[in-house]
């Protein structure tokens, strides 16, 4: 059995994931508040709002504080001369080996939150799908993109 990939994503990725989850939790809180207001106006049982509020609170705690930390711990990647090794997953751990001969192109992308922390996601496209390595420091993402592109081109020329 192979060893785990050695490289982890940036620690700032944890902050980005937490911010994303806070935004999602805030939207969900607005829905809970809307249900509470509707409960008041339409004389629905108040326990509905209470249960929704409790579910929101528990879900927010888990998705903001626990899942990002575990997710950061399990995300790993490593680039070899002939393949890219990506491992992710919390409950179901997925290990993907992408042969360099299958790589069609490599992109980096940044959303507003990633840009705030100078992070980027590297997307590796094959004929079948797109594999992503999230929340890498921008310099590392650029280096990785260029390295994969160079290795894929060399491998492609050899075939």
Swiss-Prot record:
Give the matching Pfam families.
bPH_2
The transmembrane segments are 22-42, 47-67
According to its record, what are the GO cellular component terms?
plasma membrane
Q: What is the recorded membrane topology of this protein? A: Multi-pass membrane protein
Q: Where in the cell is it found?
A: Cell membrane
- Keywords assigned: Cell membrane, Membrane, Transmembrane, Transmembrane helix
User: Which InterPro entries does this UniProt record tie to the protein?
Assistant: YdbS-like_PH (IPR005182)
The keyword DNA-binding is assigned to this record: no
The text of the family note is:
Belongs to the UPF0699 family.
> How is this protein named in the record?
UPF0699 transmembrane protein YdbS
């Amino acid at each position: 059995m192979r060893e785990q990939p050695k490289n982890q994503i940036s620690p700032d990725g944890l902050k980005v994931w937490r911010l994303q989850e806070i935004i999602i939790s805030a939207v969900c809180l607005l829905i809970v508040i809307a249900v509470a207001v509707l409960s008041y106006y339409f004389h629905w049982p108040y326990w509905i709002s209470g249960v929704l509020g409790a579910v929101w609170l528990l879900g927010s705690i888990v998705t903001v504080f626990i899942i990002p930390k575990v997710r950061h711990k399990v995300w790993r990647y490593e680039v070899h001369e002939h393949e890219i090794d990506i491992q992710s997953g919390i409950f179901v751990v997925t290990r993907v080996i992408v042969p360099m001969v299958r790589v069609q192109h490599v992109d980096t992308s940044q959303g507003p939150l990633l840009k705030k922390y100078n992070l980027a996601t590297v997307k590796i496209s094959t004929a079948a799908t797109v594999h992503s390595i999230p929340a890498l420091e921008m310099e590392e993402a650029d280096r990785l993109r260029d390295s994969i592109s160079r290795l894929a081109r060399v491998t492609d020329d050899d075939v």
